[in-house]
């Protein structure tokens, strides 16, 4: 589902929450991110500050968690000590290959992973919301520097 401010407002209202200007601004940032870009809470905070849209870091953390629980954002562990987020686009499933040395991240598609996720979910009676695979390794550049 592609979220607009109106659809986000409707879903938030349905769950007993409201669409605040801060939530709308955070949604807008993620909608305008270039493909393949992921933001941490701190990245988002700095981005908003640079645009003269100061939102407290605690509000950002709460909003990111809420939007991830709603399925609007994907929460990612990208080999760092904090989470990153990206817009969840169900029709654009992709996975991540991450270098544990330099944190270089490559996105890739795999229908096999999605099929396994769908089959396993169905077998266990789950409704599949998202299926993501994260592979951790050492990139060729970092391998050369280890030798």
Curated annotation (Swiss-Prot):
Fe cation binds at residues 93, 95. It holds the Pfam family FUR. Keywords: Cytoplasm, DNA-binding, Iron, Metal-binding, Repressor, Transcription, Transcription regulation, Zinc. Residues 1-90 are annotated as: DNA-binding. CDD domains: Fur_like. Belongs to the Fur family. This is Ferric uptake regulation protein. It comes from Synechococcus elongatus (strain ATCC 33912 / PCC 7942 / FACHB-805). The gene is fur.
């Amino acid at each position: 589902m592609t979220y607009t401010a109106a659809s986000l407002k409707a879903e938030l209202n349905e769950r007993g929450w409201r669409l605040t200007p801060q939530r709308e601004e955070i949604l807008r940032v993620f909608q305008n991110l270039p493909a393949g870009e992921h933001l941490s809470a701190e990245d988002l905070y700095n981005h908003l500050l640079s645009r003269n849209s100061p939102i407290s870091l605690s509000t950002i953390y709460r909003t990111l968690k809420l939007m991830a629980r709603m399925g609007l954002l994907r929460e990612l562990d990208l080999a760092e000590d904090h989470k990153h987020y990206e817009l969840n686009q169900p029709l654009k499933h992709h996975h991540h290959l991450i270098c544990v040395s330099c944190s270089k991240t490559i996105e890739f598609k795999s229908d096999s992973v999605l099929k396994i996720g769908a089959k396993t979910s169905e077998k266990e009676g789950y409704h599949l919301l998202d299926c993501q695979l994260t592979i951790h390794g050492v990139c060729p550049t970092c391998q050369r520097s280890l030798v």
